Design a protein with these regions (language model features):
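PP2C/PPM-type serine/threonine phosphatase catalytic domain
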Residues: 1-240
Length: 240
């Protein structure tokens, strides 16, 4: 059984520039989340364009390949660049997930994240395209210190940059057991450690329950001027 749920909140900001969408096709479940950059609503347009384009990747119910996903990211980037003729500041991070019967594929640009849990334990996660992640790679800080790192929000890659390409793609076979995926913007993960996400997952039996706990934790711990925070949760129970 698969359950999926999403939420998006403007947090302490005047405008919500996050976008999250999902669709359950006949053979594929596709989820996409974008965190727009640019301010004044321009980022919202960018994240909407990216999500509208990428949600179609998998709609034909065929196996989504790395090459197909790259082409879809390219198409989204071209659309954003075209729109920049009017709104030249607009860019967006993106994280994409497609789950089928026995496999999953995901890709991302920027610092919106995907977490994969297997049988209740964190199994994998994306690495931010950011200055803070470079500091982790150089052993200057550990992963839990990213939210407090100076210049944490500075990212190297985002859709809306000329010649930008999909940087990170991962494909896995879904082994028997329980799987859970979380796609989220930085407004979520900067307040939730890997351990806390795992703890909240253990308290939930469906995606909606898990997401409710995540949102509650964010809203109870965020400052007044907190960033937009959005997430999509997918839970697969007892795949055999």
């Amino acid at each position: 059984m698969i359950t999926i749920e999403s939420y998006s909140s403007k947090g302490g900001k005047n405008v919500n520039e996050d976008t999250c969408v999902f669709c359950v096709y006949e053979k594929n479940l596709v989820a996409v989340l974008g965190d727009g950059l640019g301010g004044h609503g321009d980022g919202k347009k960018a994240s909407e364009i990216a999500c509208e384009q990428l949600i179609q990747c998998g709609s034909d119910n065929e196996e989504v390949t790395k090459e197909q996903l790259i082409r879809s990211f390219d198409a989204a980037n071209e659309q954003i660049l075209e729109q920049q003729k009017n709104d030249y500041h607009m860019k967006t991070t993106v994280v994409y997930l497609c789950v089928s019967l026995d496999r999953a594929i995901w890709g991302h640009i920027g610092d919106s994240r995907l977490y994969h849990f297997y049988n209740g334990e964190l199994a994998d996660y994306t690495l931010d395209h950011s200055i803070a992640q470079v500091a982790v790679s150089l052993n200057e800080i550990n992963r839990d210190e990213i939210p407090e790192y100076p210049g944490r929000s500075k990212i190297f890659h985002a859709l809306g940059a000329a010649e930008e390409k999909l940087k990170s793609v991962k494909y896995i076979q879904l082994e028997p057991g329980e799987h859970a995926f979380l796609l989220c913007s930085d407004g979520v993960w900067e307040l939730l450690s890997d351990e806390k996400l795992t703890e909240l997952l253990a308290q939930a039996s469906a995606a909606g329950e898990w997401l409710k706990l995540i949102r509650q934790f964010v809203e109870e711990n965020m400052p007044e001027d907190h960033d937009n925070h959005s997430a999509i949760a997918v839970m697969i129970s007892e795949r055999t």
